[in-house]
């Protein structure tokens, strides 16, 4: 897909003016900015960015033990399944004894989102979130949940998504030397008063 406008105006310089290549389902490493020409190849591109730079360990988890270099690598690929809480910032204050709406987004590399689970107790228990409309396999999928803090104090909120292929975000991030494809479950801490 070629993008030349955004929000009804020419694409801004920082976003790739005059034209940007958009590759749904793939990481931004493939979203070429300031596109001037297109060359169609029948083999993998052998330039620096494919052969040396944007590479991950060539195994099922795209990970290695911390500090260990991978034996073999491959180019970065499709998005991993990922989700975020977008309605509350880390450190937010919420009212004790009142329902707190929690919203966010989930997405992946094109399989589509099957389920989102929400935890208000640092991952000890998980509850199904309500999924918003499915706008297509490459779209963000909104989700909604709610929790009522029953006592004053700190709460660790977590969210994790599962896609239609059965892939679920890992509770702990997987490590690789470049930090690519990070999709561990994030935590948003809130205080109830």
Task: List the model feature ranges, each with a label.
Residues 1-193:
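Extended, aromatic/histidine-rich regions of cofactor-dependent oxidoreductases associated
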């Amino acid at each position: 897909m070629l993008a030349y406008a955004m929000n009804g105006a020419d694409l801004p310089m920082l976003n790739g003016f005059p034209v940007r290549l958009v590759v749904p389902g793939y990481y931004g490493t493939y979203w070429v900015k300031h596109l001037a020409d297109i060359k169609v190849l029948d083999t993998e591109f052998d330039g620096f960015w494919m052969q040396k730079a944007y590479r991950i360990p060539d195994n099922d988890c795209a990970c290695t033990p911390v500090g260990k270099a991978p034996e073999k690598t491959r180019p970065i690929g499709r998005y991993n399944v990922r989700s975020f809480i977008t309605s509350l910032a880390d450190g937010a204050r919420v009212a004790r004894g009142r329902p707190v709406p929690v919203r966010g987004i989930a997405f992946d590399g094109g399989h589509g989102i099957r389920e989102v689970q929400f935890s208000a107790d640092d991952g000890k228990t998980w509850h199904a979130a309500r999924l918003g409309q499915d706008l297509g396999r490459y779209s963000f999928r909104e989700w909604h949940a709610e929790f009522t803090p029953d006592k004053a104090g700190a709460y660790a909120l977590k969210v994790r998504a599962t896609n239609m292929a059965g892939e679920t975000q890992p509770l702990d991030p997987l490590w690789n030397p470049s930090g690519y494809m990070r999709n561990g479950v994030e935590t948003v801490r809130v205080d109830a008063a």
